[in-house]
Amino acid sequence: SRDRREKKIYLSQEQYIRKVLQRFQMENAKAVSTPLATHFKLSVKQSPSNEVEKTNMSRVPYASAVGSLMYAMVCTRPDIAHAVGTVSRFLSNPGREHWNAVKWILRYLHGTVDMKLCFGGDKPTLMGYSDSDLAGDIDSRKSTSGYLIKFAGGAVPWLEEEPITFTLTHE
């Protein structure tokens, strides 16, 4: 939507997010205030290790849900980037706790469904933010870093990634 008087443009995916919540039966879930709670210590060790567990998890729409979250993240919801990046690491063999984390992200979206990206206002300022962790990936002990650039109050291209590691050898 657009507010000409305030010189602002708002981008929203409220309808899309509501459809996603319905598709995964989370439209009546209790909302949470963070994209991914600290009690989630996700690891490949939580992936199914036997055929019964794998069969049970094959009935869970994990990949579809993560794909839906990725679309929202890329278009208008950079606030879920870290959480979506975390759950996407387990797409090849998700376990029950990984699915619980995906549902947590959906609960967060349920509580923030009306959030919008806002561009514009009086001063077109440029702001940058960054964050990182040290060995936050339980399985690989890799670190993660990310940044967000805002222009005129709205997020513009952002990135979260594992840093590139270089090894020097002397011959």
Predicted segments, located by residue:
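Long, low-complexity, charge-biased intrinsically disordered regions
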Residues: 1-171
